[in-house]
C-alpha cells in the first residue's frame, strides 16, 4: 500500500526567503506562483539561503515579467571563470493567461508586482508574486491600531479565564469589564 503524500505549498521547511515588509507596505490583492530562470551558482546560493527579497520588485517588459532588486549573494566557492552579479535581473516564468491578466492589471494606477516568498517546490525554485496596491501612511497606522486592539482583547480574555463551571470571583465580572472596555475603545476611535 502506497503512502499518501500531503500537499505542502510554502511550508516552513521549503521556504527560502520571505518579504515581510511587503505585507506592511502594500494591500495584497492577488497572488501568483512563478518559476525563475537561474544560473547554477544562483541555485547553490539559494540552497545556502543567501538571498534578500526586501528591495525586490517585478516589471513587465516586452510581454515578459522580470525580477529586479533581489540580492542573491554568491558563495565563496563559485568558479573563477564566472563573474556573478548579485543584483542581476531574472526572468519569471508564468502561463500566458496569467501574463495577459497581469499586463492589464499592472497598467492601472497604483498597482505593482512585488515578490512575497521564495520557496522550493518539487526540487525547483518558485517565487510567489503579488498584485498589490501601495498603502498610504494613514493606512499603515490604521492596521497598526487594529493589530494592537486585537492583542489587547486577547490579553483581557487570557486574564479572565472563562469556563462554564468553577468561575473565579473576577470571571463573573470579567465579561462586564470586557464589554465596558470594548464600548470605551469604540468611542475613542
From Swiss-Prot:
GO aspect biological process, one term: trans-translation
Top-rank taxon: Bacteria
Family stated for the protein in its record: Belongs to the SmpB family.
Protein name per the record: SsrA-binding protein
Keyword Cytoplasm: yes
Gene3D superfamilies linked: 2.40.280.10
Cellular-component GO terms for this entry: cytosol
Keyword set, alphabetical order: Cytoplasm, RNA-binding
Pfam family, one: SmpB
Compartment(s) of residence: Cytoplasm
Functional summary from the UniProt entry: Required for rescue of stalled ribosomes mediated by trans-translation. Binds to transfer-messenger RNA (tmRNA), required for stable association of tmRNA with ribosomes. tmRNA and SmpB together mimic tRNA shape, replacing the anticodon stem-loop with SmpB. tmRNA is encoded by the ssrA gene; the 2 termini fold to resemble tRNA(Ala) and it encodes a 'tag peptide', a short internal open reading frame. During trans-translation Ala-aminoacylated tmRNA acts like a tRNA, entering the A-site of stalled ribosomes, displacing the stalled mRNA.
Record-linked PROSITE patterns: SSRP (PS01317)
Native organism: Nitrosococcus oceani (strain ATCC 19707 / BCRC 17464 / JCM 30415 / NCIMB 11848 / C-107)
GO function terms (MF aspect): RNA binding
